[in-house]
């Protein structure tokens, strides 16, 4: 089986071969090395990411294992509480989602009944979800005529003498709990259908949940240490045997991985006496170091490991940065060379445990030299980029694209006096993330050619992006940028499915869309009802000149890095949900998707196989390559 996987990896340059590889990855993790000997763990969830970073046909497959793990993700953002908006109808009043809907009803009734309003002003009322307690309060204030009566009881003729009583329809709604509707007119009332929504847009628009990007960039320097984890092959899969740091110690243990990790953590704790956060700098660490340590992470050690972050029981944090994501695809030695340090080879990963044990002294020496080179290169690069991209600091970002684009957006927006804001709370962050679709939308299954947008950068740099804090609006204003919670109805006739939904049997569903995606969907025949939106009154002007100025500055510093960065930006604009410019990514991806749809409009739908926001699969039998298609590159 290993031979079969090795052959597949060498020829993994087409869709069919990669799909066969995926089948193996459902059962095994592939142990591989790159040309510098850096270990790489390939599993089903990260193969796409790895293929975007490197040519996997050049990797050396060492083995297969089931004794490993994926990165342990941070605890998921809790789902926001489901929400029902307030409905004030002539026949009834339904309060918005609340822990105390009865209190909301009595306050609403006080708008019409001055004696209730006076009692509330003079005495107040404690929150309660008990009808009997509300009635007790009303009676004590001489307002028993407004007592609350359940609709079912009223229909039993028990309370007809109380003509002014407050009749409420009681119900239990899934994922929300008890809810009450005040029935104003018994003759015309019928229980309404109330939309249960995933977000409260009014809440999300609150000023305190948004902050100016520039305010988050002014951070003091945090201590940085270069680190590398080395693993050997055993009968039970890969095993970490050495953790090297610079400046710092090297930890080696062939008998107990637990003790190896505990010694490393004790050392980390000792050097954190004057700071609550430090940065560990690795190279391709997300592909080997971190997942390998995660497999063996000891319980009850005082630290939890989540993705690239270590969090101690007392709140201290260690952030594991991957310098490779700032290298624009350079090998470790090329990265060190281009940033002025002496390139040193590093020990090979995934060697036999016996070989590692026999050569441990030379491996320690080789590791220290390599880490010293990485540390010096990283310090030089971070210093240079922080000058060019001020006030952005390298350790605040997970990849160079984020840092570069944040710098450009901040510079352009500040120069025009309009800053871009970002959400500081999980719920608005989740709302923005929900508006992004990176999935492929399947149209027809057929043999196809793959096309990609020639330059994502050209498309997104000429567009507008939100500036300032958002405002809540019930419906977005044409010509303004907004993100709306929408009820979407699929066209009844044959259509290209431009709005992603994971249930093909549903013709109406609720989702989050940008104003750009709404325009695209309406062009495609969808019916869109907006259920509330975040709208921005101001826009950041086009970014093209700011992008070109920044590219030139970096090019003067390091031409190789700039050329590679420009290539990455042209080909990709991938959403990063931890980015403070998530709003930019949201609209950038929508603009790309609108561009893809404009091309699909020129093609007979029978020839379209699938598409994403930047790629389009067209039937191999399609020959009419029109002018629109010339803006795509065939892969």
Swiss-Prot record:
Keywords: Early protein, Host endosome, Host-virus interaction, Membrane, Microtubular outwards viral transport, Viral release from host cell, Virion, Virulence. Induction: Expressed in the early phase of the viral replicative cycle. InterPro entries: Poxvirus_F12L, RNaseH-like_sf. One of its GO terms (cellular component) is host cell. Its main location: virion. GO terms for biological process: microtubule-dependent intracellular transport of viral material towards cell periphery. It is found in: Virion membrane; Host endosome. Interacts with protein OPG164/A36. Interacts with protein OPG064/E2. Plays a role in intracellular enveloped virus (IEV) transport to the cell surface through microtubule transport. Together with protein OPG064/E2, forms a complex that interacts with host KLC2 (kinesin light chain isoform 2) to engage the kinesin-1 complex and thereby promote IEV trafficking. Belongs to the orthopoxvirus OPG056 family. This is Protein OPG056. It comes from Vaccinia virus (strain Western Reserve).
């Amino acid at each position: 089986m290993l031979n079969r996987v090795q052959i597949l990896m060498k020829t993994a340059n087409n869709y069919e071969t990669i799909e066969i590889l995926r089948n193996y990855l459902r059962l095994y993790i592939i142990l591989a090395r790159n040309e510098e000997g850096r270990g790489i763990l390939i599993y089903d969830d990260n193969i796409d990411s790895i293929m975007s970073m490197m040519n996997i046909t050049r990797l050396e497959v060492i083995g297969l294992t089931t004794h490993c793990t994926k990165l342990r993700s941070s605890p998921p953002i809790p789902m926001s509480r489901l929400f029902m908006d307030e409905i004030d109808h002539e026949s009834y009043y339904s309060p918005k989602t609340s822990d105390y809907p009865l209190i909301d009803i009595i306050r609403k009734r006080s708008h019409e009944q001055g004696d209730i309003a006076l009692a509330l002003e003079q005495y107040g009322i404690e929150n309660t979800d008990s009808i009997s307690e509300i009635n007790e309060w009303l009676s004590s204030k001489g307002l028993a005529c407004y007592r609350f009566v359940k609709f079912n009881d009223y229909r039993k003729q028990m309370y007809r003498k109380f003509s002014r009583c407050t009749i409420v329809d009681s119900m239990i709604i899934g994922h929300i709990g008890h809810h009450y509707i005040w029935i104003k007119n018994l003759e015309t009332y019928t229980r309404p259908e109330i939309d249960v929504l995933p977000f409260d847009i009014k809440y999300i628009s609150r000023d305190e949940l948004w902050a100016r990007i520039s305010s988050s960039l002014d951070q003091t320097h945090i201590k940085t240490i270069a680190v590398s984890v080395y693993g050997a092959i055993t009968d039970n899969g890969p095993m970490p045997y050495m953790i090297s740091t610079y400046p710092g110690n090297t930890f080696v243990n062939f008998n107990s991985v637990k003790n190896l990790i505990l010694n490393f953590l004790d050392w980390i704790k000792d050097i954190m006496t004057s700071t609550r956060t430090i940065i560990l700098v690795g190279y391709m660490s997300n592909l080997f170091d971190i997942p390998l340590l995660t497999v063996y992470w000891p319980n009850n050690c005082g630290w939890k490991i989540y993705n690239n972050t270590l969090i101690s029981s007392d709140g201290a944090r260690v952030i594991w940065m991957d310098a490779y994501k700032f290298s624009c695809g350079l090998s470790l030695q090329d990265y060190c060379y281009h940033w002025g340090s002496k390139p040193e080879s590093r020990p090979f990963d995934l060697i036999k445990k016996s070989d590692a044990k026999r050569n441990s002294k030379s491996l320690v020496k080789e590791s220290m030299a390599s880490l010293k080179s990485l540390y010096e290169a990283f310090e030089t690069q971070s210093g240079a980029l922080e000058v060019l991209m001020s006030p952005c600091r390298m350790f605040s970002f997970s990849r160079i694209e984020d840092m570069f684009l944040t710098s450009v957006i901040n510079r352009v927006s500040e120069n025009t006096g309009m800053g871009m804001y970002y959400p500081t709370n999980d719920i608005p962050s989740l709302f923005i993330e929900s508006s992004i679709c990176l999935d492929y939308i399947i149209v027809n299954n057929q043999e196809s050619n793959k096309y990609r947008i020639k330059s994502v950068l050209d498309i997104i740099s000429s567009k507008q992006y939100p500036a300032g804090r958002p405002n809540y609006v019930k419906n977005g204003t044409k010509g303004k940028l907004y993100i709306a919670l929408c009820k979407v109805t699929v066209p009844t006739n044959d259509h290209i499915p431009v709005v992603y939904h994971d249930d093909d049997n549903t013709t109406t569903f609720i989702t989050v869309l940008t104003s750009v995606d709404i325009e695209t969907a309406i062009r495609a025949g969808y019916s869109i009802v907006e259920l509330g939106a975040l709208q921005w009154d101001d826009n950041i002007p086009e970014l093209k000149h700011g992008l070109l100025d920044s590219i030139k500055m970096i090019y003067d510093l390091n031409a190789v890095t700039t050329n590679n960065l420009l290539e990455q930006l042209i080909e990709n604009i991938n959403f990063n949900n931890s980015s403070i410019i998530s709003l930019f990514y949201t609209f950038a991806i929508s603009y790309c998707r609108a561009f893809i749809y404009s091309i699909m409009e020129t093609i007979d739908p029978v020839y379209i196989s699938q598409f994403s926001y930047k790629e389009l699969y067209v039937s191999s039998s399609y020959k009419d390559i029109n002018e629109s298609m010339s803006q795509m590159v065939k892969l």
